[in-house]
């Protein structure tokens, strides 16, 4: 025989309160039974980067967050033992003719990487072209599988084509786009930013540029005004190849050049220039990065 128990008014109100609270929390996506998921801070994340005027360093810092480790490719390239293992490994570098700087290519070719999640973020200033596809193919040739490759539009520091004073005025929505990339990577999103359409002539031009343009000779590219140079050593400190040396009165340079223009942008006297520039008086450095940061990233001691 069933025995029916009557519910007191107090118990009924208590039960109703639990139901209402549960419904309210559910509408916000939270649960009364489980805490929201948190990012695992115990995961080891390595970020390898190449920077000239700070764009890629800024991005690398944002991707590293509080617990990631930043590693400068120019400071590592000469090491004999380049074996790296982590939960997550990332690469951040600028787009050079729809490819990576030569030093980045050399580093990836000679190093060994092991990680559960590998990603690349490529900064560019005007036209990314098929750089993500190039990165995917290049890394696969080296036995490296990217799970995520994306591009980020930023200030273009290429002085022969762009006026830096005009470039910095353009709203390229960098914070919003970068935040979206950071979220993608935290969530281990699988994505390659494929470029579907490109003129065959453009493809051929970029391929010839990649194969024949780099490395360059510093002597052919740079112009030095010895009258305004004060031998301060800034160019020597920011050059990823270590191509500069100081005399008592001025700088001297020679050797293979990445054409990153770090030296030209950083010179406090504007003594270093190129043969052709849109605005010889305008220079650029990412506002979130100091000159000291770039020196620490690139100086060849």
State the predicted function of each range.
Residues 74-154:
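Helix-loop-strand module that forms the ligand-binding subsite of alpha/beta enzymes
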Residues 1-7, 35:
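N-terminal secretory signal peptides
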Residues 132, 148-230, 278-301:
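Ferredoxin-type iron-sulfur electron-transfer modules and their immediate structural context
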Residues 28-52, 58-66:
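C-terminal segment of N-terminal export signals and the immediately downstream linker at the start
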Residues 67-71, 94-98, 243:
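Short, flexible loop segments at the rims of nucleotide/cofactor-binding pockets, characterized by
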Residues 69-76, 247:
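Short gly/ser/thr-rich secondary-structure transition/capping motifs
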Residues 32, 37, 224, 230-258, ...:
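Iron-sulfur cluster-binding cysteine motifs and their immediate structural context
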